[in-house]
Protein backbone atom coordinates (compact mmCIF):
# COMPACT_ATOMS: atom_id res chain seq x y z
CA UNK A 1 0.00 0.00 0.00
CA UNK A 2 1.13 3.53 -0.71
CA UNK A 3 2.01 5.88 2.15
CA UNK A 4 4.56 8.65 2.70
CA UNK A 5 7.89 7.81 4.31
CA UNK A 6 7.66 10.87 6.55
CA UNK A 7 5.33 13.85 6.92
CA UNK A 8 5.63 17.34 8.29
CA UNK A 9 2.54 16.99 10.51
CA UNK A 10 1.17 13.78 12.03
CA UNK A 11 -2.49 14.76 12.39
CA UNK A 12 -3.69 17.33 9.85
CA UNK A 13 -7.11 18.98 9.70
CA UNK A 14 -9.76 17.33 7.56
CA UNK A 15 -10.05 20.22 5.09
CA UNK A 16 -12.83 20.58 2.53
CA UNK A 17 -13.49 19.20 -0.93
CA UNK A 18 -14.85 22.33 -2.61
CA UNK A 19 -13.83 23.38 -6.09
CA UNK A 20 -12.29 21.67 -9.09
CA UNK A 21 -8.76 20.40 -9.62
CA UNK A 22 -6.53 22.94 -11.36
CA UNK A 23 -3.43 20.74 -11.63
CA UNK A 24 -3.16 17.17 -12.87
CA UNK A 25 -6.19 17.51 -15.13
CA UNK A 26 -4.52 16.65 -18.46
CA UNK A 27 -2.89 13.42 -19.59
CA UNK A 28 0.85 13.91 -19.15
CA UNK A 29 2.48 10.48 -19.59
CA UNK A 30 0.25 7.93 -21.34
CA UNK A 31 -2.36 7.80 -24.10
CA UNK A 32 -5.50 7.02 -22.08
CA UNK A 33 -6.58 8.03 -18.59
CA UNK A 34 -9.24 7.76 -15.90
CA UNK A 35 -10.55 11.15 -14.77
CA UNK A 36 -12.48 11.86 -11.55
CA UNK A 37 -15.87 13.57 -11.89
CA UNK A 38 -16.64 13.97 -8.17
CA UNK A 39 -14.67 15.08 -5.10
CA UNK A 40 -13.64 12.44 -2.54
CA UNK A 41 -10.93 10.84 -0.47
CA UNK A 42 -9.48 7.76 -2.17
CA UNK A 43 -7.75 5.38 0.24
CA UNK A 44 -4.42 3.71 -0.45
CA UNK A 45 -6.25 0.34 -0.56
CA UNK A 46 -8.57 1.57 -3.31
CA UNK A 47 -5.62 2.94 -5.30
CA UNK A 48 -3.84 -0.41 -4.93
CA UNK A 49 -6.86 -2.46 -6.04
CA UNK A 50 -7.22 -0.25 -9.12
CA UNK A 51 -3.52 -0.69 -9.87
CA UNK A 52 -3.81 -4.49 -9.66
CA UNK A 53 -6.70 -4.51 -12.14
CA UNK A 54 -4.81 -2.30 -14.59
CA UNK A 55 -1.55 -4.28 -14.40
CA UNK A 56 -3.53 -7.39 -15.31
CA UNK A 57 -4.66 -5.73 -18.55
CA UNK A 58 -1.44 -3.89 -19.37
CA UNK A 59 0.96 -6.81 -18.77
CA UNK A 60 4.40 -6.34 -20.34
CA UNK A 61 3.32 -4.57 -23.51
CA UNK A 62 2.00 -1.38 -21.92
CA UNK A 63 2.92 1.05 -19.17
CA UNK A 64 0.90 2.32 -16.21
CA UNK A 65 1.14 5.57 -14.22
CA UNK A 66 -0.63 6.31 -10.94
CA UNK A 67 -1.21 10.08 -10.82
CA UNK A 68 -2.47 10.35 -7.23
CA UNK A 69 -0.67 9.66 -3.96
CA UNK A 70 -2.21 9.14 -0.49
CA UNK A 71 -0.45 11.78 1.59
CA UNK A 72 -3.17 12.63 4.14
CA UNK A 73 -3.46 10.52 7.31
CA UNK A 74 -6.97 9.85 8.62
CA UNK A 75 -7.16 9.41 12.38
CA UNK A 76 -9.57 7.22 14.32
CA UNK A 77 -10.25 6.60 17.97
CA UNK A 78 -10.87 3.14 19.43
CA UNK A 79 -14.52 2.07 19.68
CA UNK A 80 -16.08 2.76 23.06
CA UNK A 81 -13.74 5.66 23.89
CA UNK A 82 -15.28 8.60 25.75
CA UNK A 83 -15.27 12.13 24.38
CA UNK A 84 -12.18 14.25 24.90
CA UNK A 85 -8.65 13.00 25.51
CA UNK A 86 -7.25 14.31 22.24
CA UNK A 87 -7.25 13.35 18.60
CA UNK A 88 -7.01 9.70 17.55
CA UNK A 89 -4.10 7.87 15.97
CA UNK A 90 -3.50 7.69 12.21
CA UNK A 91 -5.39 4.65 10.84
CA UNK A 92 -5.02 4.88 7.06
CA UNK A 93 -3.91 7.20 4.26
CA UNK A 94 -6.01 8.96 1.63
CA UNK A 95 -5.45 10.99 -1.53
CA UNK A 96 -7.61 14.11 -1.76
CA UNK A 97 -9.21 14.09 -5.22
CA UNK A 98 -11.14 16.98 -6.80
CA UNK A 99 -13.25 16.78 -9.98
CA UNK A 100 -11.10 16.78 -13.11
CA UNK A 101 -8.07 15.03 -11.59
CA UNK A 102 -6.49 12.23 -13.63
CA UNK A 103 -6.20 9.09 -11.46
CA UNK A 104 -4.47 6.58 -13.74
CA UNK A 105 -2.81 6.70 -17.15
CA UNK A 106 -1.91 3.83 -19.48
CA UNK A 107 -0.22 3.44 -22.84
CA UNK A 108 0.93 0.65 -25.13
CA UNK A 109 -2.45 -1.05 -25.45
CA UNK A 110 -5.27 -0.66 -27.98
CA UNK A 111 -8.16 1.69 -27.23
CA UNK A 112 -10.80 -1.04 -26.62
CA UNK A 113 -8.47 -2.82 -24.18
CA UNK A 114 -7.65 0.49 -22.45
CA UNK A 115 -11.36 1.34 -22.20
CA UNK A 116 -12.17 -2.05 -20.66
CA UNK A 117 -9.21 -1.86 -18.26
CA UNK A 118 -10.05 1.63 -17.02
CA UNK A 119 -13.74 0.75 -16.74
CA UNK A 120 -12.86 -2.22 -14.53
CA UNK A 121 -10.56 -0.01 -12.42
CA UNK A 122 -13.38 2.55 -12.14
CA UNK A 123 -15.52 -0.06 -10.35
CA UNK A 124 -12.93 -0.05 -7.57
CA UNK A 125 -13.18 3.72 -7.10
CA UNK A 126 -15.76 5.29 -4.74
CA UNK A 127 -16.65 8.03 -7.29
CA UNK A 128 -17.91 8.55 -10.83
CA UNK A 129 -15.11 8.65 -13.38
CA UNK A 130 -14.71 8.96 -17.13
CA UNK A 131 -12.38 7.57 -19.78
CA UNK A 132 -10.21 10.24 -21.46
CA UNK A 133 -7.81 10.16 -24.42
CA UNK A 134 -4.78 12.33 -25.01
CA UNK A 135 -5.62 15.40 -27.10
CA UNK A 136 -3.76 15.59 -30.39
CA UNK A 137 -2.20 19.04 -30.77
CA UNK A 138 -2.17 20.39 -34.36
UniProtKB/Swiss-Prot annotation:
GO terms for biological process: mitochondrial translation. It is found in: Plastid, Chloroplast. CDD domains: Ribosomal_L16_L10e. Pfam families: Ribosomal_L16. Transmembrane segments: none annotated. InterPro entries: Ribosomal_uL16, Ribosomal_uL16_bact-type, Ribosomal_uL16_CS, Ribosomal_uL16_dom, Ribosomal_uL16_sf. The keyword Coiled coil does not apply. It comes from the Eukaryota. Belongs to the universal ribosomal protein uL16 family. HAMAP family: Ribosomal_uL16 (MF_01342). This is Large ribosomal subunit protein uL16c.
Amino acid sequence: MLSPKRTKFRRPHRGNLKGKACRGTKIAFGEYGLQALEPCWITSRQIESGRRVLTRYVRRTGKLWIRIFPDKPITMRPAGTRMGSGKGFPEYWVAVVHPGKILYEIQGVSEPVAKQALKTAAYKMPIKTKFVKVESNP
